[in-house]
Amino acid sequence: MGRLRVGLLFGGRSREHEVSVVSAAAIAQAFAAGDNGDRYEVIPIYIEKDGRWRHTERVGIPEGTAPESSLWQFPAVVDTIDVWFPIVHGPNGEDGTIQGLLELMQRPYVGSGVAASAIGMDKILMKTVFGAIGLPQVPYVALQRSDLWSDPCRYNHLCDRIETELGYPCFVKPANLGSSVGISKAKNRQQLTTALEVAAELDRRIIVEAGVVARELECAVLGNDKPQASVVGEITYSSEFYDYETKYTDGRAQLHIPAEIPPAVSEQIRSLSLQAFQALGAAGLARFDFFYVPSTGEVLINEVNTLPGFTALSMYPQLWAASGLSFPELVHRLVQLALEWHA
C-alpha cells in the first residue's frame, strides 16, 4: 500500500497568513519524521493573499505570483489528495468556509466541520453556546457595527451600558478575528470609544468583555466522539495583555507546562474543556482558554480555537508533548481521526 497523500493547505487571505505558513512548516517537518515518512506524502497547497491556490514543492511563500487564469481553478494535484490538513487561520480559514469547500470536494479533512468551526470563530456565537450549557464565563456585551455608526446618541448610550455592566478595564474585540488581532484594552471612556472604532473597522460584530485579574490557562483537546484533554498550561507575559506581537514574538510570552495550579483546578479545566468540545460538536482538535481567579477559586472559560497554531511557540502541540504525545505522533493521530470522522 502506498503512502497516504496529505494536502497541507496553508496561507490564506486573513491577517494571520504568515502564522499559517509557519504552522504549516512545522507540520510538514512532523510528517517527515520517523514512521510518518513511510506513512504520508505531503502535498503543500499554498493559498495566496488574493485567494489563488498554488501547488508548491515545499512549505513556504513561493516567489512570484500564480497566473491570472488560476484564480478560479485548483491545481491538478488536488484531485490526487486523500486527506486534507487545513492550517489556514482566521476568516476564510477556520470559520467554516474552507471546511464547507472540503465537504463539497467529498474528501476527509483534519478538524471540526462547518458548524463547529463557524461557532468557534464567532466569539458571540461561541459564548452563547457556552452560556446555554451553563459554563462559567466573564460578563460581556455584544454589539453590531451598525449600533455604533447609526446614531451618536445611541453610541453614548452603548458606552454608558458598557461602563455600567462591565466597568473598566474592559477588552474590545472584533468577534471574528483570531490571534488577538484588533483587540484593545480600555481603561476609560476615551480609550473605549477608540477601541470600538478599531474593532468596527475590522468586523461587523463586536464583543466587549469585562477585565478580570486572573491567571491565563489553556487546555488542548484531541479526539472525536470520545475526546481526551491534555495537561493544563499557563501563559505569562509582561505586556498589557496577550496581543498579537506578544503571542508570536519569541521571548515575549512564557509558557509554563504543566501549570502550577491546584490539582482540583486542573481537573475542572480539563472537564470543562471536554464539555465545551462536545457542546460545539467539534472534531479532531481544539484548544480552550480559561481564566483562573486565585482569590475566589473561580475558573472561567474564555475562548475556543478550533484550529490552533502549530508553530514552535504554539501551546497546542506543546501541551500534548507534555502529555506524552510527540509532534509527529500528534499529526498522525489527527489524520487518523479525520479518516475516522469522515468514514
Curated annotation (Swiss-Prot):
Biological process according to GO: cell wall organization; peptidoglycan biosynthetic process; regulation of cell shape
Domain of life: Bacteria
Pfam families listed in its UniProt record: Dala_Dala_lig_C (PF07478), Dala_Dala_lig_N (PF01820)
PANTHER family: D-ALANINE--D-ALANINE LIGASE, D-ALANINE--D-ALANINE LIGASE A
Function according to Swiss-Prot or TrEMBL: Cell wall formation.
Family designation: Belongs to the D-alanine--D-alanine ligase family.
Protein name per the record: D-alanine--D-alanine ligase
